[in-house]
Amino acid sequence: MVADPPRDSKGLAAAEPTANGGLALASIEDQGAAAGGYCGSRDQVRRCLRANLLVLLTVVAVVAGVALGLGVSGAGGALALGPERLSAFVFPGELLLRLLRMIILPLVVCSLIGGAASLDPGALGRLGAWALLFFLVTTLLASALGVGLALALQPGAASAAINASVGAAGSAENAPSKEVLDSFLDLARNIFPSNLVSAAFRSYSTTYEERNITGTRVKVPVGQEVEGMNILGLVVFAIVFGVALRKLGPEGELLIRFFNSFNEATMVLVSWIMWYAPVGIMFLVAGKIVEMEDVGLLFARLGKYILCCLLGHAIHGLLVLPLIYFLFTRKNPYRFLWGIVTPLATAFGTSSSSATLPLMMKCVEENNGVAKHISRFILPIGATVNMDGAALFQCVAAVFIAQLSQQSLDFVKIITILVTATASSVGAAGIPAGGVLTLAIILEAVNLPVDHISLILAVDWLVDRSCTVLNVEGDALGAGLLQNYVDRTESRSTEPELIQVKSELPLDPLPVPTEEGNPLLKHYRGPAGDATVASEKESVM
């Protein structure tokens, strides 16, 4: 038995001579920690699990949903789910979708108004230009990757087998087609909504009617409002409205504070919804698998096409986008991706970029250190215009259908597919059944038959989820790149350009008490840290 070293009155071990003649003091607590290293590591594991509990629950929910769906669909008999029982089975997932969609409108409008009002017009223009450039370049890269993979893997080479098995369904279920010009005109119309209230739940879309004009049947375009939020129009209005509030100067500060407070309250709701997300995701994934009649046969027939899409999404999401992030920031991109695992899993479960937006904002701000005025300005724009996954999938599908129809694609047609996929993916968020309708636009642009889109619809439930994951990953990495740009700009300048730096005395008509926690106030504490010495109000001029 080893005797304890002598201790002083403060619990420190007696001083022992060191090799250089000095004295070393070791506390009893340090010795206990060294002796109980196993307990310390166990505490570290416990803290790590507690910190990443939501991430682990979300990933487990996806795996459990796949297992549950395969188990229920394979059991049959008494466990077979008809349409009425299936709707009850997926009800927890439906609740999650409804909760997330409830948050989208106030979150997008308030965050964009507050973000646009917090930046001077020059900084706003620079941030917007860099964001759009990043989104455009990555979408073009995704489109090129999709075309290259489809030409290399030849997913539509086995045309005879696929046509024999599902050719009848393809001829019976034609997807709605739209002229390319009308599609881009609809995009422009949705940018400028005629009614902001109806834009919250309706968007403009052109349909066609056959009319008898001078004895001939003519297809006439007819505009109508269809179900689906016009998020593109709301984004444009919110940005312009935020700039207008900034131009008002002191008169607009009260309204800016209102939108900032509204946005903070919305984020509190998001933090509550996040803990229900794993339950909803599990039942959404399981319900979609149960809904498919024969998953194994479907993969056997279209496995090469599915492989091409998923492989393209994996290459773009795990190699291309992280490489771009690393080249510009010199930071580990995979550490950044670990911080957004929860919204990525939510994107897979909900298959909606907009529904994932609240969780993505919270995670990039809290886990990856992106400033609020950047994340809440860039992420809503990215959810609207950045569709890397959709562009890649549409290019693969277009080449797949061309191979299926035994039509060759020359250089001009390939360039047309790339440009059309990049441009049409911008408006996909504002179009009901977005991905499939924009695919019809691409097929029309290169004179390919649209009747084979039914094959794409058969596996869209899986490919679309992969598209959504890639879309939201691109949004988050774009926000991280812009945060790095802002940090470098501020480090070069004594007066940061991208935040308000102009100070003025508080206005007498609108005194703001410090207890309100106003984001437009900066509080400074004295040397003792016991009282506020001065406060500045950041000008919105």
Curated annotation (Swiss-Prot):
UniProt binding sites for Na(+) 2: T384
Residue intervals annotated with topology Cytoplasmic: 1-51, 117-130, 249-257, 329-333, 365-373, 483-541
Region annotation Disordered: where it falls in the sequence: 511-541
UniProt-annotated location(s): Cell membrane; Melanosome
Activity vs pH: Optimum pH is 7.
GO MF terms held by the record: amino acid transmembrane transporter activity; antiporter activity; L-aspartate transmembrane transporter activity; L-glutamine transmembrane transporter activity; L-serine transmembrane transporter activity; ligand-gated channel activity; metal ion binding; neutral L-amino acid transmembrane transporter activity
Swiss-Prot/TrEMBL GO biological process terms: amino acid transport; erythrocyte differentiation; glutamine secretion; glutamine transport; L-aspartate import across plasma membrane; L-glutamine import across plasma membrane; neutral amino acid transport; protein homotrimerization
Transmembrane segments: 52-81, 95-116, 131-153, 225-248, 258-285, 307-328, 374-400, 461-482
Function field: Sodium-coupled antiporter of neutral amino acids. In a tri-substrate transport cycle, exchanges neutral amino acids between the extracellular and intracellular compartments, coupled to the inward cotransport of at least one sodium ion. The preferred substrate is the essential amino acid L-glutamine, a precursor for biosynthesis of proteins, nucleotides and amine sugars as well as an alternative fuel for mitochondrial oxidative phosphorylation. Exchanges L-glutamine with other neutral amino acids such as L-serine, L-threonine and L-asparagine in a bidirectional way. (Microbial infection) Acts as a cell surface receptor for Feline endogenous virus RD114.
The protein's name in its UniProt record: Neutral amino acid transporter B(0)
Lineage: Eukaryota, Metazoa, Chordata, Craniata, Vertebrata
